[in-house]
Swiss-Prot record:
Cofactor(s) this protein requires: Mg(2+)
Residues that bind Mg(2+): D8, D10, D212
InterPro entries tied to this protein: Cof (IPR000150), HAD-like_sf (IPR036412), HAD-SF_hydro_IIB (IPR006379), HAD_sf (IPR023214), HMP-PP_phosphatase (IPR023938)
Keyword Aminoacyl-tRNA synthetase included in the entry's annotation: no
Protein name: HMP-PP phosphatase
Active site residues of this protein: D8 (nucleophile)
Keyword Transport: no
The reaction(s) this protein catalyses: 4-amino-2-methyl-5-(diphosphooxymethyl)pyrimidine + H2O = 4-amino-2-methyl-5-(phosphooxymethyl)pyrimidine + phosphate + H(+)
Annotated family: Belongs to the HAD-like hydrolase superfamily. Cof family.
GO MF, one example: phosphatase activity
Keywords, sorted A to Z: Hydrolase, Magnesium, Metal-binding
Domain of life (superkingdom): Bacteria
Organism of derivation: Salmonella typhimurium (strain LT2 / SGSC1412 / ATCC 700720)
Length: 272
């Protein structure tokens, strides 16, 4: 039986309205009753995740910023990785040929250069929001990650520009169809989960993980049991064809799967 369960948030544990369903919350509590350690592995900021955790009365480790930070149950930093300052400086100051909006993250919060109210819909559960600022004024040595939000085709073209400018100095990935992330080289949820597993005296084979986007690829591909959401990006399903696909986040598919796993561990699972 798995001893550590890792959950992506958006498109996985959260429903389409960005809330946690009652069944999901109850199932997470059942895992803790079985002494299974929980970790939420997300692109969201730790400041936001602490608020969400506080509403759940659950103990969980936090992997945030797509692996740039790991926090203990007590809130202590177990691991941190920032963007190379030269990479951050290049990304923040270059005039990219794109319509996408730029968003910069550091330990103090989420920063962007203009009001984009539509982006706040994903944060209604926590009330977390961006701070409008001149992005070029942010110290490059304090940046954890940078992301661009916009049309997918535009972001694909932007990724080509970023790859040419940054070469092998950063890790680029899509955390959603409309969100392209610039992360520290070698930084992803999978590498962070490996650090956490080692800290807990476990191996990745002792873990199960759930996700729906390309920023979940390394995590899902490295654990003992990786499970892909039915609403996942097609690229993720194609990249990990050997993994099982469960149901849709709107139907609380993670809870559905885990309830079956807890009650009938030796029987085959069907998402129907």
């Amino acid at each position: 039986m798995a001893r550590l369960a890792a959950f992506d948030m958006d498109g996985t544990l959260l429903m389409p309205d960005h809330h946690l369903g009652r069944e999901t919350i109850a199932t997470l509590a059942r895992l803790r009753e079985r002494d299974i350690t929980l970790t939420f592995a997300t692109g969201r900021h730790v400041l936001e995740m602490r608020h969400i955790l506080g509403t759940l009365s659950l103990d969980a480790y936090l992997i945030t910023g797509n692996g740039t930070r790991i926090h203990s149950l007590e809130g202590d930093v177990l691991h941190r990785q920032d963007l190379d300052p030269q990479v951050a400086d290049t990304v923040m100051h270059h005039a990219w040929d794109t319509r996408a909006s730029m968003h910069v993250f550091n330990d103090n919060g989420w920063f962007t250069g203009q009001e984009i109210p539509a982006l706040l819909q994903a944060h209604v559960y926590s009330g977390f929001r961006y701070q409008v600022i001149d992005i070029k004024s942010i110290p490059a040595h304090q940046v954890t990650k940078i992301c661009f939000c916009g049309d997918h085709d535009d972001l694909i073209r932007l990724r080509i520009q970023l790859n040419e400018a940054l070469e092998e100095r950063a890790h680029l990935c899509f955390s959603a169809v409309d969100c392209l992330e610039v992360l520290p080289l070698g930084c992803n949820k999978g590498s962070a989960l490996a650090v956490l597993s080692n800290h807990l005296g476990l191996s990745l084979a002792d873990c199960m993980a759930f996700g729906d986007a390309m920023n979940d690829r390394e995590m899902l591909g490295s654990v003992g049991r990786g499970l892909i959401m039915g609403n996942a990006m097609p690229q993720l399903i194609a990249a990990l064809p050997h993994l099982s696909v469960i149901g849709h986040c709107g139907n609380q598919a993670v809870s559905h799967f885990l309830t079956h796993w807890l009650d009938n561990p030796h029987l085959p699972y069907s998402p129907e």
